[in-house]
Amino acid sequence: MKIVQTAGRAALGEFAPEFAHFNDDVLFGENWNNQDIDLKTRSIITVVSLMSMGITDSSLKFHLQNAKTHGVTQKEIVAVITHVAFYAGWPKAWAVFNLAKEVWNVNEGDLPYEDEAMRAHAKEMVFPIGASNEAMQQA
């Protein structure tokens, strides 16, 4: 999946065109499309970096949503934020958790696949994935 970003030009294209270029073409166009790190890992690294700096504004929320888009589950982001809290600070974790709760629902993405239709189907099956199956155990 190729990352394409136009927010820099949209927000700052006339006012700061060089910065917009660096944002859209270099940061996102080149760095985010580098194949040496997968997008899920890159997203986690970005969230951790912003959290460590105490940046808990709309840019962090964007990157939390981006992490979700690239396969980070609710349980994974909770584990990441909790781990980083011990190194970057407890108040920062609280701030990030408040944003993360706006992006993920509890247990969202905890199945081994991320497709919405498949998740919905898995929860409605005769024997839903992840649910106990007492009827089968008694047979």
Kindly label every feature range from the protein language model.
Residues 41-51, 60, 64, 77-81:
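Short, structured motif recognition centered on aromatic/hydrophobic residues
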Residues 49-56, 88-89:
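Short alpha-helix boundary/capping elements
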Residues 1-41, 60-61, 69, 93-139:
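Acidic, glycine/proline-rich low-complexity segments that act as flexible tails and inter-domain linkers
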Residues 38, 56, 71-78:
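Helix N-cap / loop-to-helix initiation motif
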Residues 65, 82-85, 98-101:
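Short amphipathic alpha-helical surface patches that mediate protein-protein
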Residues 33, 51, 68, 86:
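Short polybasic/polar patches that bind polyanions
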Residues 43, 83-91:
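Substrate/cofactor-recognition hotspot
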